[in-house]
Curated annotation (Swiss-Prot):
The modification Phosphothreonine is found at residue 2. Pheophytin a binds at residue 126. Signal peptide: none annotated. It is a multi-pass membrane protein. It comes from Chlamydomonas moewusii (Chlamydomonas eugametos). The keyword ATP-binding does not apply. Its EC number is 1.10.3.9. Chlorophyll a ChlzD1 binds at residue 118. Belongs to the reaction center PufL/M/PsbA/D family. This is Photosystem II protein D1. It catalyses: 2 a plastoquinone + 4 hnu + 2 H2O = 2 a plastoquinol + O2. 2 of the reaction center chlorophylls (ChlD1 and ChlD2) are entirely coordinated by water. Tyr-161 forms a radical intermediate that is referred to as redox-active TyrZ, YZ or Y-Z. The gene is psbA.
Amino acid sequence: MTAILERRESTSLWARFCEWITSTENRIYIGWFGVIMIPTLLTATSVFIIAFIAAPPVDIDGIREPVSGSLLYGNNIISGAVIPTSNAIGLHFYPIWEAASLDEWLYNGGPYQLIVCHFFIGICCYMGREWELSFRLGMRPWIAVAYSAPVAAATAVFIIYPIGQGSFSDGMPLGISGTFNFMIVFQAEHNILMHPFHMLGVAGVFGGSLFSAMHGSLVTSSLIRETTENESANAGYRFGQEEETYNIVAAHGYFGRLIFQYASFNNSRSLHFFLAAWPVIGIWFTALGLSTMAFNLNGLNFNQSVVDSNGRVLNTWADIINRANLGMEVMHERNAHNFPLDLAAFEAPSINA
């Protein structure tokens, strides 16, 4: 009896590392994008948790009036936030080593910039990792394309908007009430509700929710029962089964009669493309709108557009919105300026006789 021993070629440590990184047999795929994604998202998450709990007040407006955002400084889960980097820093890169001390770095809101920059890199790498895993498995790349919509939205509020406004202090605070404050101030300064791209985004999000609910309920209502009445219909599905799990003809017939025939998809692939494309395209448009408003290309302005024969203004809903915008604008950053920008923009009258 002859035993043949095959000599395994010795592979370098680097080659084995590369094979492990790109292996689709791992419980969680890492990938080359994951090599960057994991440390950046861990850093952003860790600093966010620490700052949300214990960060000292931040001089957000750069006028020596610190604003408290952490739990240990009097906030709760609703009011708490990681306060954006100070207006005194503007758009300057502000890592820890650029500050004279850790206290100064915290006072100027350094953690916000650290979190946002690492988070941005992390979510971009997550998108790349989705593409990378799809590529390794021989799948099409549309999962990463769909994820690009929330990435674009996050990029708009955390990166593009501060760049357009000239300071990271204008970025969205990392908290619940901070998010709402950002939305209110954004409406006051940019009239976002009257921007067509934001309207498309609203249609995308609400429409996507409606279509998702319609699709899920139709499928659930037209399952092909493989079980008795005494057990759940869900128990009749076997993972990887070749048979259809629901009757698309029945679903098509129901919806076609509920609305009209051509309102219902008879092609499952077209249907699922539509379900993905509708909210993604809507959110793309919203991100694009935010990015244009970052540079003060604002929503449509119909203020005082209706006048009578004597030239008197007849107020419309646009004028009511404008008055609300002015009220919100004078209330935010109360001590940083005395008047809203559009009231302070007029040239002062001459006092010379």
